Each structure stands twice: as structure tokens, then as C-alpha cells.
Design a protein with these regions (language model features):
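ABC ATPase NBD coupling module
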Residues: 21, 76-96
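Short coil-to-helix segment of the ABC ATPase nucleotide-binding domain corresponding to the Q-loop/switch region
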Residues: 108-117
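Conserved ABC ATPase "signature" region
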Residues: 78, 126-144
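Conserved ABC transporter NBD signature motif
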Residues: 66-78
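Helix-to-loop junction immediately C-terminal to a conserved catalytic motif
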Residues: 58
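The feature captures the beta-strand-to-loop junction immediately N-terminal to the Walker
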Residues: 43-45
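Conserved structural motif at the start of ABC-family nucleotide-binding domains
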Residues: 5, 27-29, 90
Length: 146
């Protein structure tokens, strides 16, 4: 199986600079591989670090230690040490992040929301919608919800 995301030794602490540099550990030494076609669930109580992990995988948060490698253009890119332009390219074409606080525009079909990134990359409307249909089907989202 093709590894799409490989996480090794990932740790994240938040530093409270206004309180003398107190460190709050969120997670430490996390290892995770996600392969093509897998569906992964992050499960845990509020405050366990699920959202922090996702933000670290997307390079919104800089980890305290470890590596986040994402398959991009046939090779693995380590987002913990990548140049900003590389992070933008990986986000543009290889990995996405949807916040749990997503707010969508009423009356815009989910199909169009999913197709939008392809349109922004230059795909014509119909091929973008075809790809969006394929993705929504792979996620087993009923067509009545599109």
C-alpha cells in the first residue's frame, strides 16, 4: 500500500509566553502512517489533542519535535522542515483540511463546495464536478446530500 502520510516522533507543546514560558504538553512521540484508501478516525475526549494533531499535519502548527511527511508529486515532503512555498503547494494539490467549524453558504450544493479546489487549479466545471462526485462516492456520502 502507498503511504500517503507518515508521522514519526511527533510532539506538540504550547508555550504560554505571558506566563513565564510555561509549557503545556499536548502529545508526545506520536507515530502514524496513513495509506491510500484508508479511513482513519481520531477518537478521544475534548482536549485530548485531536484538532492540534490535525493542525500539525496540515502545518498550521509547528510541532515541538518529530516529522510529518506527505506524499506529493511522487515523493515525501516533510512539512516540519519544508519551505513555505512547498507547504502551499502540498496544500494546494495533495492534502486538505476542513475545520470542524466549517461554515458553508446556504443553497450551494456540497458537490460544488467539493469541486471548488479543482476549479481554482484550472479544471473546467464539468471535470471538477466529476472528480467531486467520485470523491463523495468514495466517502459513501449519499447523493441526496450533495
Amino acid at each position: 500500500m502507498t503511504t500517503m502520510i507518515s508521522v514519526s516522533g511527533l510532539s506538540k507543546d504550547f508555550v504560554l509566553h505571558t506566563q513565564g514560558g510555561v509549557r503545556i504538553p499536548v502529545f508526545a512521540g506520536l507515530d502514524l502512517d496513513v495509506h491510500a484508501g484508508e479511513c482513519v478516525c481520531l477518537h478521544g475526549p475534548s482536549g485530548a489533542g485531536k484538532s492540534t494533531l490535525l493542525r500539525s499535519l496540515y502545518a498550521n502548527y509547528k510541532p515541538s519535535a518529530g516529522h510529518v511527511r506527505v506524499l506529493h508529486d511522487g515523493g515525501m515532503v516533510d512539512l516540519t522542515s519544508a519551505e513555505p512555498w512547498q507547504v502551499v503547494e502540498v496544500r494546494r494539490r495533495s492534502v486538505g483540511y476542513v475545520s470542524q467549524f466549517l461554515s458553508v453558504i446556504p443553497r450551494v450544493p456540497a458537490l460544488d463546495v467539493v469541486a471548488e479546489p479543482a476549479r481554482l487549479l484550472g479544471a473546467d466545471a464539468e471535470s471538477a464536478r466529476d472528480r467531486a462526485r467520485e470523491l463523495l462516492r468514495r466517502l459513501n456520502i449519499p447523493e441526496r446530500l450533495w
